[in-house]
Amino acid sequence: MPEHVVDLHADIRELASWLERAVQLRDVIDAYLLTCAIAQVMDDWAEGTDSIPRRLTALLGDGGVARRGVRLAADIGLARRAVLDGREVRRVRAEVDRLVSRLADGVVADAEAGEHVMAEAGASVARLARGLAGLPSAVLGGLARPPSCFRSFDQHPRDCVELARRFAQQHPDRQRAGLLVLGVRTSGAYLAPLIAASLRVHGFGRAAAATARPGGPLPAAALAAARRGAAKGAVLVVDDPPSTGGSIAKIVRSVRRHGFEASEVLAVYASFGGEPARALPEDLPRVVLPAAEWHIRRLLGGARVEELVRRALAGQDVVDVASDEPGLPDRSGHLGVRVTAWVRDESGVRRHELRAEGAGTGYLGRHALEVAERMTGLVPAVYALSDGVLLRASGEALPASAVPADVMVGYVAARRERLRVACDRGSELRGRQPVWEIASRIFASGFGRLGPVVRPVLIDPLLRSALTSANPCLTDGTTAFAAWEKSAIGTVRKADYEDGFFSHLDLACYDAAYDLAGAAVALPETRPALPAAYESAVGEPIPPSRWCVYQCVQAWNLRRVGAADGDPRRAQARALQGLFGQLFLGDLDDEPTGPWCVLDVDGVLELDFGGVPATTVAAMTALRALRAHGFRVLLATGRSLPEVRDRCTAYRLAGGVAEYGGVAYGAGDGSVLDLVDGEVWGLRRDALVGELARSSAVRIDPKYRWCVRAAGLEAAAEAAHPWFTAVRGDAQTDFVPRGVEKAAGIRALLASLGEKDAPVTLAVGDTAMDIGILRMAERGYAPGHAGRALRSAGVARTRAPYQAGLAQAVGRLIGHRPGGCARCAVPRLRSADRLVTSLVSVGERGRRGIVPSMLELAVLRARLGRKAGPWT
């Protein structure tokens, strides 16, 4: 077995080599797919798809002076590229186009005609190989994007044939000037030539194919050819199944601006059920293949499945085969059916539980066989693969909570060892949402509207380098979803081992630690133990910042796909808490025994970081100073009990008051002190929840048990209740039982800790709900951003806002700037740790912190430019 597994993010040299092999084997499907991949790489290079100007254009959205300026810069760069290198590239690209068209004819034809096409293809491929060898290295090094249509979505070439038939049936006029099937890259680049070839079979002799990306240039020559002649031409815009239809809509609008009438531009696509593609123009003519008519459903029909089983078990006495009726394909994963086979041997008739499911077309699906072979014992046994349908062993589905942590760690470590690749190509996947690019989007949140400008220039290069793996492998990518099965003999196997990498969800990453982070998000109770177990298995620790970033991206993905299980925002918050706690407090072993300090959370200890609460460098430096100088810290917050518990664990705090004083938590023994009358309060709370729930727009946070936190309340928030005080926040309204108050909660908590009369030396809060704790403290401070209520109450304010204000308050208490003495100095952080914590901390000084943060990033970027290879 080769040392390295096949990487479908292949460059042109690899694609050309595989193409020559496909021609030798007379494999028309693979030859077609590989030639399309070469075309895609060349087109993306010619259009500068992944260049910084193009990416900035996309990030800046529609319109505006900035976007027009960046677009002009991109066009100038492409013009220069076309003059210097474009002639030879265009010549070879024309050769590729002719080969794609001819191979598409072979794919849609019958077997005999396809064989004839392949017999003729050898000379064309040899000529193409010679041409490719002379291309610039920038073109040869471009990477293929596996098409979602034939990799993730179970589309089949026969679906393209059927779409062409439906168009021909609806538009019988074969005398059109020309038909251009315009594919939306990437998937459209694979679908369009097949539809065009099928249209030629139906008598549309001038049907041709071309491709474009939304926001990119249109193929002007191909569009002009479609208009040539007296009769009207038409443009058929094709893509994989649209969710909103936004990509198709952009291309359609561009084509209409090119001079085509609305009736001359059509959308052609296969559809998932229940996705209305709302972004498509209402007047857009469409040719749609509904989910019920996809070819995969025929391939998974009873007769086809039985035939596949009998071929796979040839030589055995197969008594009978039964399978479920296939459902409808959807975006969540490959369509599959349960299969039961009864096989007779010397001991009698045995029952075998199997599953037949889509895997992908041609070499894109065959990749699953190689991965399964290398991962033997950890994934289900595979018996056959035919025409994009894989037959494998099946077992009982397991929930995430039932998967032992050691099994998860073993699986991740095995992928790291068995699925090694030659290099980490994630850094070359700009514009394709690899993990580092999504991490950049997440960690640019502090820059607000400047984020799209800062990301490509400063944040992207830094995170791209920081997340490059020294031991690259093909990751699973779906460990946060935990699709595991248990066999009849009790072994646990990863069922969707091939669905994540190279998928429509993107998120390419070559670091096995990313898969472990998915497990941490899915199994939060095992999260603390996973890094150590992984280090023990592979002999290498996971750097703290990398572990945090990977968890944040996994949580982001759970939010994106709308996962029903878990709490992605809380998972991301935990990841950030864990990073800051480890870096800033991990070396302070001695438990403080000195005076008490009370801190609010939101706006004081933490800020809003893209919709997720996060602490900052200033706040943690202040917290470190308090701990190092012997002060004990309690939290007083409106957040829920589970969230207070998370922070006490991460920040090593003695306890806290949650839900505005409704409940207190002692971290030492895990005690919970209920501070609201139970029975009466429960009835009143239930009544309020029922009242709020009458509005379908209202969302009740289930973590809150004493107060009621409700979002989506614009009108319902006015639902006054005599037993509650409504506290309006930026994104929610909290209903607090009357009489519940943070200061009383702190007193009760101190009493439960055996410190009933202990004074509070310092308190910091920023809202009217904090006035009680600020007045009870010997030193009560509000950060500089605090509102009018605290000013009216005469509370002392710091000059700086937010977490920088907290640091100033702590400095006044200890007599020097936090971190300014040997006792509380912050340990030296590694470059990657400093990068991530600095990105989270951009807002700790309000808007005044943005420019200094950009300068700090520029310095890091300059240092990176002088250093070869990845850095940590």
What function would you assign to each model-found segment?
Residues 614-701:
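Active-site phosphate-binding/coordination module
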Residues 334-460, 481-482, 496-546:
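Conserved ATP-binding subdomain of kinase catalytic cores across diverse folds
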Residues 592, 596, 613-616, 736, ...:
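Mg2+-dependent phosphoryl-transfer enzymes with acidic/Ser/Thr/Gly-rich catalytic loops
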Residues 1-332, 396-404, 420-424, 850-857, ...:
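PRPP-associated nucleotide enzymes
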Residues 181, 623-647, 697-714, 726-731, ...:
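Substrate-recognition element of Asp-dependent hydrolases with the DxDx(T/V) motif
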Residues 440, 444-448, 517, 532-584:
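Helix-rich C-terminal or lid/interface subdomains of diverse kinases
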Residues 562-601, 834, 864-865, 871-872:
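Non-catalytic pre-domain segments flanking phosphatase-related domains
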Residues 421-476, 487-488, 571-590:
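An alpha-helical support segment within catalytic cores of ATP-dependent transferases
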